[in-house]
Amino acid sequence: MAKPRKRGRDIDGVFLLDKPQGMSSNDIMQKVKRVFQANKAGHTGALDPLATGMLPICLGEATKFSQFLLDADKRYQVTAKLGERTDTSDAEGQVVETRDVQVDVQDILAALPHFRGNLMQVPTMFSALKHQGKPLYEYARAGITVEREARPITIFDLQFIAYDAPYLTLEVHCSKGTYIRTLVDDLGEYLGCGAHVTVLRRTAVANYPVEAMMNWDTLQVLAAQQDLALLDQHLLPTDSAVSALPALHLNQEQSKAISFGQRVKFDNPTQLTGQVRLFSDTQQFLGVALVDEHNVIRPQRLMTQNT
């Protein structure tokens, strides 16, 4: 008779990992899940194996709110090598084209405004986007190119940091769904020399503080102490995933109704509408709801209440 599968801990929160280079986001997420002995985990937007930086990992009930971090703005620092294009638009790919680089700082500064604002971007073939149920990168590795539709993105800011030819370093503040490799490839084409990513670091997701990140080596040192309570001190609260939403505090009666998934009519002196994060009369995070124009709270995503 097979032994019952061991269940992890019911631990909830968000761990801010400084992802190491060379590991996939899913692989490192599974490692973090094992370190915390969590029963459930999910990351909030994959980073390429080449990339490092902020990777929020949601544990337990926090996985219910991971979509809010997937949808959040991101910030990156990227270094590109001008003069070479690769099939993946980064240093892990094969060089497919080499050109002379006759670009100076003024050329770069003149080009950057063309890549700020609302843009349409065609995703790279080397992406996890799916076509007929299969990731695009599987087609790409088989030498098959699939027609991709351009998708709307927003580059809120694109700043020049340094240029030591042929290496260009930029800072990017962008919307969800932005492929930095594609942005660099497009910029290289605009400059007439081609380019690919050599270094990519995610510096921010939503409003999470950089100083709250922990690298993998430090986490392993903590894990070796076999003190779960010590590890748990490094988790951010579940509601941090939705901190961009306005908070709505409920009384005891309202809290109880919401916890059962019921809609609640309430006095709304501030005329608050749209998505909100809900807190009980005891300051417990209840979840996310929608306040409609009739001052009715409609639950959307709720924490599981212990009974």
From Swiss-Prot:
- Family named by the database record: Belongs to the pseudouridine synthase TruB family. Type 1 subfamily.
Reactions catalysed: uridine(55) in tRNA = pseudouridine(55) in tRNA
Q: Which UniProt keywords apply?
A: Isomerase, tRNA processing
InterPro entries associated with the record: PsdUridine_synth_cat_dom_sf, PsdUridine_synth_N, PUA-like_sf, PUA_sf, tRNA_psdUridine_synth_TruB, tRNA_sdUridine_synth_fam1_C, TruB_C
Q: Which GO terms describe its biological process?
A: mRNA pseudouridine synthesis; tRNA pseudouridine synthesis
EC numbers, comma separated:
5.4.99.25
This chain's source organism reads Pasteurella multocida (strain Pm70)
Molecular functions (GO terms): RNA binding; tRNA pseudouridine(55) synthase activity
> What does the record give as the active site?
48 (nucleophile)
Indicate whether Isomerase appears among the record's keywords.
yes
HAMAP family linked = TruB_bact
This chain belongs to the protein called tRNA pseudouridine synthase B
Tell me the lineage of the source organism: Bacteria, Pseudomonadati, Pseudomonadota, Gammaproteobacteria, Pasteurellales
Protein task:
Responsible for synthesis of pseudouridine from uracil-55 in the psi GC loop of transfer RNAs.
